[in-house]
Curated annotation (Swiss-Prot):
Any GO CC annotation of this UniProt entry: mitochondrion
Modifications the protein undergoes after translation, according to the UniProt entry: Phosphorylated by GSK3B; this promotes proteasomal degradation.
Protein name: DNA damage-inducible transcript 4 protein
UniProt record similarity statement: Belongs to the DDIT4 family.
PTM-bearing positions, type Phosphoserine: S16, S118
Alphabetical list of Pfam families matching this protein: RTP801_C (PF07809)
Compositionally biased residues, Low complexity: 9-18
Molecular functions per Gene Ontology: 14-3-3 protein binding
Biological processes per GO annotation: apoptotic process; brain development; cellular response to dexamethasone stimulus; defense response to virus; intracellular signal transduction; intrinsic apoptotic signaling pathway in response to DNA damage by p53 class mediator; negative regulation of glycolytic process; negative regulation of TOR signaling
Assembly behavior: Monomer. Interacts with BTRC. Identified in a complex with CUL4A, DDB1 and BTRC. Interacts with TXNIP; this inhibits the proteasomal degradation of DDIT4.
Lineage: Eukaryota, Metazoa, Chordata, Craniata, Vertebrata
Function: Regulates cell growth, proliferation and survival via inhibition of the activity of the mammalian target of rapamycin complex 1 (mTORC1). Inhibition of mTORC1 is mediated by a pathway that involves DDIT4/REDD1, AKT1, the TSC1-TSC2 complex and the GTPase RHEB. Plays an important role in responses to cellular energy levels and cellular stress, including responses to hypoxia and DNA damage. Regulates p53/TP53-mediated apoptosis in response to DNA damage via its effect on mTORC1 activity.
Source organism of this protein record: Rattus norvegicus
Keyword terms: Antiviral defense, Apoptosis, Cytoplasm, Mitochondrion, Phosphoprotein, Ubl conjugation
Source taxon at top rank: Eukaryota
Length: 229
């Protein structure tokens, strides 16, 4: 009579031999294809070359591992996931931003030249890249509204799009602030709004290093994300 251990061993070996790896779970490529389709769906009416897919088939993780890995990444670690193309686009965007600020109007008929300190320029660039990292089209899908706070009012300065041919997937509102030490100059600028001065630029004004960014996804009903820096 066979022992209990022999029967258990025979049953286990026959069970394991009848099971195939393919039946346990789908191949990793199926997850990559599904992720790619999801990314392309978010950029409807765009060619596939216009978007960075959300393909994770080459990441070395399965769906569950990918999700748990991304959940565990802290915000500073996103610098390690930077995209060279997005970094190049961000540099161009910062140049457009400075050009727009050089002709800003703050309630006056004459444009003021608003200057961004180097620290502010660097911080804004990093924040925009961080907010764009999870978007299907990256920074190319951003529509950037630029505003400047002046006391209790907020003036719209410009609306920038890196790729006008691309349907925006998310909107960023950048709220800059004037340096509080410049209030006497600002008041003088506003008081000259109705004066008959020779057309041209008013005096230059420096912006504060503090700013706020509001993110709104245009393909989702998620709540607004407000980042204070």
């Amino acid at each position: 009579m066979p022992s209990l251990w022999d029967r258990f061993s025979s049953s286990s070996s026959s069970s394991s031999s009848s099971r195939t790896p393919a039946a346990d779970r789908p191949p990793r490529s199926a997850w990559g294809s599904a992720a790619r389709e999801e990314g392309l769906d978010r950029c409807a009416s765009l060619e596939s070359s216009d978007c960075e897919s959300l393909d994770s088939s080459n990441s070395g993780f399965g769906p569950e591992e990918d999700s748990s890995y991304l959940d565990g990444v802290s915000l500073p670690d996103f610098e390690l996931l930077s995209d060279p193309e997005d970094e190049h686009l961000c540099a161009n965007l910062m140049q457009l931003l400075q050009e727009s600020l050089s002709q800003a109007r703050l309630g006056s008929r004459r444009p003021a030249r608003l200057l961004m300190p180097s620290q502010l320029l660097s911080q804004v660039g990093k924040e925009l890249l961080r907010l764009a990292y999870s978007e299907p089209c990256g920074l190319r899908g951003a529509l950037l509204d630029v505003c400047v706070e002046q006391g209790k009012s907020c003036h719209s300065v410009a609306q920038l799009a890196l790729d006008p041919s691309l349907v925006p997937t998310f909107q960023l509102t950048l709220v800059l602030r004037l340096d509080s030490r410049l209030w006497p100059k600002i008041q003088g600028l506003l008081s000259s709004a109705n004066s008959s001065l020779v057309p041209g630029y008013s005096q230059s004004l420096t912006l504060s290093t503090g700013f706020r960014v509001i993110k709104k996804k245009l393909y989702s009903s998620e709540q607004l994300l407000i980042e204070e820096c």
